[in-house]
Swiss-Prot record:
One Pfam family cited in the UniProt record for this chain: PAN_1
Gene3D superfamilies tied to this protein: 3.30.30.180, Hepatocyte Growth Factor
One annotated Gene Ontology cellular component of this protein: cytoplasmic vesicle
Name by which UniProt lists this protein: Microneme antigen
Presence of the UniProt keyword Signal in the record: yes
Amino acid sequence: MRLPIRFPKYVLYGMASAVWSILFLHILVGDTMSAADALSWSGGLIHSPAHRVNVMRSHHHEMGKELEQQHGAEEQQMQRDTKPAAFSNPPHLATGRGPSFVHADGQLDVSCFPHDKNIGSRTTEVAVVQVSSVQDCMKQCQSRPTCSHFTYNKNSKACHLKDGAPVFYTYNGDMTGPRSCDYSCTDNCWMNSETAVKALDYSGHGPGLCWAACKGTAGCIMYTFKGSTCTLYAKDSFNKS
């Protein structure tokens, strides 16, 4: 009768330790290491210590490459998400006081005042220059710090630069505009004033010319444009809300 084979306790402990090492490594590294590789690394019964080191180095290298690729993809996505929108035609600051936005064709915006109503201004002139377009006339106004508005005659090509509040009258071919169409405050831009310096009836005119009136009036630092009435205010006559 054959007696059952009895292994020494240290052999049993060693086998159990090898099995647990295999399971632990396979769970730890997941799909990056097969069970066979885990066995070859952990058991120490099939391969040499040098082979086990090479196996781990190989898997660490592959894991490092995957992590680097993931990091690169995440960084590219972050750059796309945070990159500001590009302007195809960004706004430019015109010479002189105040911004002036340009159209896609590079021309200044002159849409805030009528071009075909024969509207002139009797206000004292700073200068008269010959230019080829109303946009060029606006540029001339912006180049002079005191210019508040201009009158351009499309027939004579004369650009009349003004430094006071507009005083309108009718003249064939005239068009009158502010130094920039970007000044477009209406209604609630300025409010809660006590004493008005001047109230002007600007029926048919835009708020840009109300701004021009304030710039061209001594002591005016604020204005309201409500309906068709432009009201100018001095420094000590208001409480800004």
